């Protein structure tokens, strides 16, 4: 057996002094933690400030190295350490993806690290959402023991897609899962790509982004249908029998889960457009907290009904035609009398408030 030697490259300065004070996962830590790199390794930090997120590997020096079976915090059953994230393991190497807030010489200020104060640092690497992120990754026993973890995983994916967590992107995730479970539809990306299931949304707000992430149904794969009805509602349909489940949420009813300060900031920052940068940042924090709450509100807050939908044709393949004015190719169905719709001066677009008519210069036609 090979003897592996590691060199400590730095140390973590953390507000967490013992296991009981640290969060179960660094991702849920809101504290700023400092990573001090030793002088002889300072050159290794060149260009690190260009990275937004880092992978930090550290040595869990207070762990039990004899453990091979553990009972994790979110399950009552025993599991092998290699199937868990337990700090107690033969080679206790900790792993965290952190946000780099600032570099000050040899000190990196980060957020998202749950390591204890004084923990040795083994290595640091840049994190890439393109290379490192696996959107459909699961821990089977964990999701079995914690049904809520599926919603958590989907909402974190929705955050990457939507840009932030807010109440209605979370409601889109929650409503999608409710509809799919009621319909007996498994989470399967190929089902949406093959148009075996369709998602019919009745709004074009944040909720729709949550639906796209949770169902895999998008405009681009022709499995998302938008009805310009202005309702917070979603229908998931099986193409094989056109049976579906429609889920509706009353926005007025869920407002009781919003804090008074969050609502006041929303009106100031979003409705009146009067907020400062600090107001916007504070609203974002409130919105994320409220978004997580939306995953836990009673299912009775949602109106759920089984429906049947009239058959909808699969997306056909159309030939292209060349516009006689601009010379560009356009779908044949969008060329009238030799002109593309833009050159003809009349077409429709989806904007923030729904479907509107534009002229050739993208001016709204009233």
UniProtKB/Swiss-Prot annotation:
The source's superkingdom equals: Archaea
Please list the residue ranges annotated as the TsaA-like domain.
6-136
Which residues bind S-adenosyl-L-methionine per the record? 23-25, 61-62, 85, 116-119
Return the PROSITE patterns for the record: TSAA_1, TSAA_2
Which Pfam families does UniProt cross-reference here? Answer: FmdE, TrmO_N
Keywords from the UniProt entry: S-adenosyl-L-methionine
Where are the disulfide bridges? none
Q: Which family does it belong to?
A: Belongs to the tRNA methyltransferase O family.
| NCBIfam families recorded | tRNA_TsaA (TIGR00104)
- The identity of this protein, by name, is Probable S-adenosyl-L-methionine-binding protein AF_0433
Q: Which organism is it from?
A: Archaeoglobus fulgidus (strain ATCC 49558 / DSM 4304 / JCM 9628 / NBRC 100126 / VC-16)
């Amino acid at each position: 057996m090979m003897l592996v030697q590691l060199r400590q490259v730095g140390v973590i300065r953390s507000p967490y002094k013992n296991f009981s004070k640290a969060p179960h996962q660094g991702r849920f830590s809101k504290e700023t933690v400092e990573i001090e790199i030793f002088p002889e390794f300072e050159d290794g930090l060149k260009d690190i400030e260009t990275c937004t997120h880092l992978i930090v590997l550290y040595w869990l020096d207070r762990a039990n190295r004899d453990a091979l079976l553990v009972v994790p915090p979110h399950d009552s059953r025993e599991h092998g350490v290699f199937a868990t994230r337990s700090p107690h393991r033969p080679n206790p190497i900790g792993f965290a993806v952190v946000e780099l807030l600032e570099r000050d010489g040899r000190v990196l200020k980060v957020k998202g690290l749950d390591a204890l104060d004084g923990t040795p640092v083994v290595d640091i690497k840049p994190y890439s959402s393109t290379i490192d992120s696996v959107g459909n990754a699961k821990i089977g026993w964990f999701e079995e023991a914690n049904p809520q973890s599926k919603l958590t995983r989907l909402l974190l994916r929705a955050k990457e897609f939507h840009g932030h967590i807010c109440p209605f992107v979370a409601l889109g995730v929650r409503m999608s899962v409710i509809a799919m479970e009621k319909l007996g539809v498994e989470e399967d990306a190929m089902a949406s790509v093959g148009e075996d299931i369709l998602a019919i949304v009745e709004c074009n707000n944040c909720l729709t982004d949550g639906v796209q992430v949770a169902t895999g149904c998008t405009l681009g794969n022709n499995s998302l249908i938008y009805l310009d009805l202005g309702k917070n509602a979603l229908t998931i349909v099986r193409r094989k029998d056109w049976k579906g489940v429609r889920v509706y949420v009353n926005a007025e009813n869920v407002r009781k889960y919003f804090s008074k300060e969050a609502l006041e900031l929303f009106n100031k920052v979003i409705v009146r457009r009067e907020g400062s940068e600090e107001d916007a940042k504070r609203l974002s924090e409130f919105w994320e907290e409220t978004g997580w709450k939306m995953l836990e509100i009673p299912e009775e807050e949602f109106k759920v009904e089984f429906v049947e939908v009239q058959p909808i044709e699969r997306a056909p393949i159309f030939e292209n035609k060349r516009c006689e004015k601009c010379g560009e190719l356009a779908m044949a169905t969008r060329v009238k009398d030799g002109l593309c719709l833009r050159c003809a001066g009349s077409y429709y677009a989806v904007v923030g408030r729904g479907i509107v008519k534009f002229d050739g210069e993208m001016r709204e036609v009233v």
